[in-house]
Every structure is written in structure tokens, then in C-alpha cells.
Amino acid sequence: MAEVELKRAGAIAYRESVSEGEPSGPPVLLAHGFPESSRMWTTVMAALAADGRRSLAPDLFCLGDSSDPGPATFERNLEALTAFHRELGLGRVALVVHDWGGFIGLAWASENPDLVEALVISDTGFFSDGKWHGMAEMMRSEQGEAVIGSLDRDGFGGLLHLDGAGFTEDDVDAYWRPFEHGRGRQATLEFFRSMDFSKLAPYEGKLGELGVPTLLLWGAEDKFAPLGGAYRFKQEIPGAQLLAIEGAGHFVFAQEPERCAAAVASFLGGHG
């Protein structure tokens, strides 16, 4: 397996994997979701490196190893992704997104259509009439502080396994760290409360206008971002391909890491 290195660009920590020799295509930029970090992409990044691709995965604010005293809102994470791409001089990229990373990454893609070579969209939403799931609604409510404040490591592990198994104990420890020692708890409230689906209205129709190859990779049993959302993306994006992983839930990259990595590498190898 190719080595995936943890690096830093200012306040943003990120993982990078580079193959030996000349890259075989544009860089791959990966945006993770809640409550994970760039760690979720390590198997995918190794598969991409084996195919000769450079890949980079930043940590969202206050998740993983990124640290910032400011609020971890949708807007600030979008600004951070934009700055990260610019400062590293990535140019055109293939973009891979999951969960929260979908809101942030797809907004970035919509605002920067000339910089997008291909898309892989996984278990997320990007529609202005979307609805939050029950856990998110609780975080957005006045109960949020009490709920997130009472969370311990065991409860956090239970949260990760609400939608199927797949995480190792090392995974749980790694993803729990910002909640135990950092601003992970407050960042959770800040992002959920800042992310009103109505904010996506300016992006309506933009993904379909990109005209780039798109793979929709979904856990067929996802309870947080159900498979129906994938079919809606398929209607909105001409030519989009759908791969639904049977038996997998929301955290499909943890539950089927090798299969997902192979699917992403194969798709981008042929299209981006």
C-alpha cells in the first residue's frame, strides 16, 4: 500500500499520497464528512497512488488535525477549501465528496466549474428543499449543547455504528480525539446550525451544467442520506453513473473500503 502522509497548510491539516513517477492525471481532491476526518480516505488514496494519481484530503475545521479558533460553519469551511486548493496550486481536479464534504465540495465545484475534471458523490445532499435527519435536527435545536456535551467515547462509538458496522477501535479513537481534546463538539453545533438547505438555492442546476463524468457511490441502506438522494442526483446530472453498495449504510467507505477504493480508482482512471 502506498504511503499516505499527514501534512499541514496553515491551519489546515491534510493527507497526501503521491505515486512514483509522473502523475497519470489531474490531482484528486477528497472532502470528508462528519464526524470523520481525512483518515476516512486512506484506502482510496492508496488505490489512486497505485494508479499513478496524486491525491489530497484536507481535514475540515476542528475535525481531524485541523485547528482554528473561528466558527466551523459551512461558509468558513467553503472558504478554507477554496484557499487550500489555491494555495497548493492544484488546478483542475477530480473531486470526491462524502456527507458534509458534499455540501462544501459541491458548492466549491459549482463556483469553480473550470477547475472540475470529474466528480464522485457519496451519501450526501445538495438540494435546497432538503431535510435534515433527526440527529442533525437535535443538534440544531436548543438541546444541542446538552446532547453534544454529554457525549463520551462509548456514545461516540455508538453513533458511528448507528448505520452499520465498519469502524475499527483505532478509527473510533482517531475520530473521537477532537471531541475529547479539541473543538469538535462546538464545531458540530456550528456546522449543523449554519447549514440551512435554503443556502443551496443559488447552486440549483449547477452540477448538471458542469458536464463532467460523475459517479454516484452510495450505501444502499443509508439511513441518514437515503438512496433516493442518489437517484435525484442521477436525474440532475446528465450521464451520471450510480453504484449502490448493497448491505452498506451511510459510512460506506468504512464498511466496504476495498470495494469503494477500487470503484473510485477505476472510475477516475477511465474518466478523470
Where are these regions (language model features)?
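Conserved HGGG/HGGXW glycine-rich cap/lid loop of the alpha/beta-hydrolase fold
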Residues: 18-65
